[in-house]
Amino acid sequence: MRLLLLLLIAGGLTITSCKRKGCTDPTAVNYSEKAKKDDGSCNYTPFIQLNGAATTTINVGDVYNDLGAVANNADGTSVPVATDASNVNTSVAGSYIVTYSASNEFGTSSIQRTVNVIIGQSNWEGFWTVTDNCGGAFPLNATPEITAGGGSAEIVIDGMFSIAIDPVPIILPNGLYIASGGTCNATIDGNQITVQQQVYDALGLGTITYSGSGTMNATGDSFTIDYTYDNSLPVIGGAGSCTATYTK
């Protein structure tokens, strides 16, 4: 009986002493699934962290200022970070990826940032040239200026119309000449523009009621609006719909 007990104890000690040692951290490059006891041998690629948010948004045409990233070894020593922002194209709306990487003797770590380039309010602002198929019944100004409205989702088209009606006896003896008249208030949502119904009063001689909607292109230098209008001015009055293209 004593011999059997000694054999059991010896066997238990042998089993205990044979437990496999190694790296038990799944994040280490040398992690061992078979290891039951960590022996402090774990090795790691650099720990890398973004400066700033993982997602950033800028308007088309803006300068992208990259915030970079930092990396350290497991012992706290710093590691140089390589940045690849070659994919970012600020001249075209879209989502782009910036990749950061850092290496040591155990391998390479990487992390990414998403840069969203969008059509924003500033892309709508400025002087534009208009081409259209509207005709005299909806006499758009060929060179309006767009300015920011009261909020970030509002813009104003200054000098919406350009009207030239020669004198007509009795009806309009002095004619009507407005080089740049009226302001159009519109709302924007990214590359979308909406012109709610509004009325332009042409010096009390008639009105132009209109509304519309449209879209800006991905490069922020052209947009199109489909208008619906009803013009009560003498000589050029009429109702209908047309399309205008604004370009920079």
Model-derived regions, located:
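Short structured motifs
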Residues: N51-A53, L67, A82-S86, T209-S211
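Disulfide-stabilized cysteine-rich extracellular repeat microdomains
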Residues: A28, E33-K36, G40, T55, ...
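Bacterial Sec-dependent N-terminal signal peptides
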Residues: L5-G52, G107, T114, G120, ...
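Serine/threonine-rich, repeat-prone extracellular segments and beta-strand-based repeat modules
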Residues: A74-V115
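Residue-level recognition of well-ordered beta-strand positions that form the cores
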Residues: V70, S101, T114-N116, T129, ...
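Ser/Thr/Gly/Pro-rich, low-complexity flexible regions
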Residues: G120-K248
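Solvent-exposed, low-complexity, repeat-rich "mucin-like" stalks and linkers
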Residues: P46-G76
